[in-house]
Amino acid sequence: KTIQKAENIKAVVFKRETLDRLVLGKWTGIPIMLLLLAFIFWLTICGANYPSHFLSWLFAQIGTLLDSLLLALEIPEWLRSCLTDGIYRTLSWVVAVMLPPMSIFFPLFAILEECGYLPRVAFHLDTCFKKAGTCGKQGLTTCMALGCNAAGVTGCSMIESPRERLIAILTNSFTPCNGRLPMLIAIVIMFFAADSTFFAAFVMLFLLIFSFSATLTVSSLLSRTILKGMPSAFHLELPPYRKPQIGAIIVKSLRDRALFVLLRAIVIAAPAGLFIWILTHTQLNSQPVILGMAEFLSPLAEPFGMDGIILLAFLLGWPANEIVIPLMLMMYLSTGSMVEMENYTALHQILTANGWTWQTAASVLVFSLFHWPCSTTCLTIHKETGSIKWTLLAILLPTVTGFTLCFLLQQLFKIIALVPAVF
């Protein structure tokens, strides 16, 4: 029996060492990590489409019934419109867009965490973050930010060094959260990868690598300027590989992560929908206030490859990034309420009819990656830092980065246009 136990232990150790040679290998570790992320994005892109379309249809039917009920109760028209076109439609869009990708992404991410792979990702990222003047634990909080930036900011409490913790908090919003992923996926599919979900997954992977590079760059700048210091030692005990309990993981991730993020977004989206409805139905100089605001912002947005409607949609989408696209559609179509599209083809036709090109889409992708954190993340940053100064800096850093990159991108497009024979 003793010999048998020893042989079993030897087999387990050998298996772990073999896996670690691949997962932690100098030439194999990073490619495996990138392929896993690309696979997760591909599953999320493919799997979220049909449930999202079904939920959009379902909520549209419920909205029709709700409108009929309010009409039967003789509710005043303005109040009925406020409840259905303002609050309800905003909430239904957020749920239909957020829930399907979250229901896929969070369990997949949790499986990687449960089987012991995520600490090995942190091991790979430790060298990168050390060169940026921080520690590998920031890599874990960066991974957490893929699900929710607010959760990533809260997770920064695991970093012992106050300086490195603050850097991690200030740069966490450079990672695209689950609220931004549907918009990124939609734009990538419509303008850059209409014929291949595999190519769309790799474009998403490139965007993720781009955002990670920006995180490292800004972290390095902070550690060499206002937050100087030496990186602390990073002690990481690699856990053994475990067979994940798939059923328990799915239930737990949906309950503790997906529903938590969704409920928080709903709480924020309801008053946001009311505010947007007021702007849409208040007239100034014979046009809705919201369109007047978009016209005012147009000259400011043009140098960055966007129009006033795009910039205003991002501003009004501060409570929840999920409502940026429907806000754009509402203003482009002048419907007075947020519009739902049945498929990407219809959405693409509307955007191109309003002047969108692939250059516009590229600028919106960059600005989606790098702009101010959502309201929930801002509140979380203030709670974690206890400082308005650091909260404002956490807002300014990604915003300035986004505007700068969009401006540089436009200059690149102008240079390319001057040499059509080459390009």
Describe each model-derived feature in a short phrase.
Residues 1-20:
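Switch/coupling subdomain of P-loop NTPase systems
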Residues 2-7, 222-258, 420-423:
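Interfacial helix-loop-helix hairpins and adjacent transmembrane helices
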Residues 30-39, 70, 74, 78-111, ...:
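Core transmembrane alpha-helical segments of multi-pass membrane transporters/permeases
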Residues 49-90, 107, 132, 153-168, ...:
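Extended, low-charge hydrophobic alpha-helical regions
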Residues 61-69, 119-150, 228-251, 332-346:
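Juxtamembrane inter-helical linkers in multi-pass membrane proteins
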Residues 100-112, 118, 133-191, 368-379:
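Transmembrane alpha-helix detector for multi-pass membrane proteins
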Residues 178-203, 376-387, 408-419:
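Transmembrane helix-loop junctions at the membrane interface of multipass transporters and ion channels
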Residues 201-218, 317:
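Alpha-helical transmembrane segments
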